[in-house]
């Protein structure tokens, strides 16, 4: 090998390619696990669900070189609604993803009024709306229907957090798997759709 064009030896490449990879979920962020799950659902033709981009307004860009443009100042254009949306078996799906290190509750400050309003609007149009909650310290994941989140949100605005007991009572635990990593469509089919599909 001539080591062209970057003078990187092929021996080094072989070493890095032959290193074993660890595919465990440990250390992977919850959102990355959801993205991997959505990619799996898409590849299997089960659902089309994507992360919503956050709209930003670019104010200033540095151009040290044409090929190295760098955004140096940008602002959120508007408050985002929920994290993900898409279609599953003819049903519109819209959901938010939250992760916490707390063991007994999820902070309510994580849910903003515009997100609650958006969820109410989705439910009014017969969409499937929920929140996926991940307690990283216990490695527990729950699907909480938006109806139950909204009810808790409105019942007592002074509550600073939603207790895990409430989530366990009204939500559905999702056991992590390999493919998909967070099989939330199973919960939707069995519990939110009552086993029906279109």
UniProtKB/Swiss-Prot annotation:
Amino-acid positions noted as binding Mg(2+) in the UniProt annotation, renumbered to this chain: 81, 83, 96, 115
| Subcellular localization(s) per the UniProt record | Cytoplasm
One CC-aspect GO term: cytoplasm
Q: Where is the signal peptide?
A: none
Could you tell me which InterPro entries the record lists for this protein?
Resolv_RecU, Restrct_endonuc-II-like, tRNA_endonuc-like_dom_sf
**Cofactor(s) essential for the protein:** Mg(2+)
An example of a Gene Ontology BP annotation on this entry? Answer: DNA recombination
- What's the record's note on cofactor binding? Binds 1 Mg(2+) ion per subunit.
Domain of life (superkingdom) = Bacteria
Query: Where is this chain compositionally biased, Polar residues type?
Result: 11-22
One GO MF annotation is: nucleic acid binding
Q: What is its EC number?
A: 3.1.21.10
Keywords associated with the record: Cytoplasm, DNA damage, DNA recombination, DNA repair, Endonuclease, Hydrolase, Magnesium, Metal-binding, Nuclease
Where is the site Transition state stabilizer?
98
Disordered: where is this region?
1-22
Could you say which enzyme class this protein belongs to? hydrolase
Q: Which reaction does it catalyse?
A: Endonucleolytic cleavage at a junction such as a reciprocal single-stranded crossover between two homologous DNA duplexes (Holliday junction)
What is the documented function of this protein?
A: Endonuclease that resolves Holliday junction intermediates in genetic recombination. Cleaves mobile four-strand junctions by introducing symmetrical nicks in paired strands. Promotes annealing of linear ssDNA with homologous dsDNA. Required for DNA repair, homologous recombination and chromosome segregation.
UniProt similarity note: Belongs to the RecU family.
Protein name (record):
Holliday junction resolvase RecU
Q: Which organism is it from?
A: Streptococcus pneumoniae (strain P1031)
């Amino acid at each position: 090998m001539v080591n062209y064009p970057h003078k990187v030896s092929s021996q080094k490449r072989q070493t890095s390619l032959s290193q074993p990879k660890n595919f465990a979920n440990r250390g992977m962020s919850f959102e990355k696990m959801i993205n991997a799950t959505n990619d799996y659902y898409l590849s299997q033709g089960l659902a089309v669900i994507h992360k919503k981009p956050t709209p930003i307004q670019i104010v200033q860009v540095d151009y040290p070189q044409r090929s190295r443009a760098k955004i140096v100042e940008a602002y959120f254009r508007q408050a985002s609604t929920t994290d993900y949306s898409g279609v599953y078996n003819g049903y519109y799906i819209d959901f938010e993803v939250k992760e916490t290190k707390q063991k007994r509750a999820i902070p309510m400050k994580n849910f903003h009024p515009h997100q609650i309003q958006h969820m109410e609007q989705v439910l009014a149009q017969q969409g499937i709306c929920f929140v996926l909650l991940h307690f990283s310290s216990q490695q527990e994941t729950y699907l909480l229907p938006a109806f139950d989140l909204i009810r808790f949100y409105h019942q007592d605005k002074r509550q600073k957090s939603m207790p895990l007991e409430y989530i366990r009572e009204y939500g559905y635990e999702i056991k992590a798997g390999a493919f998909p990593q967070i099989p939330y469509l199973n919960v939707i089919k069995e519990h939110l759709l009552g086993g029906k599909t279109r």
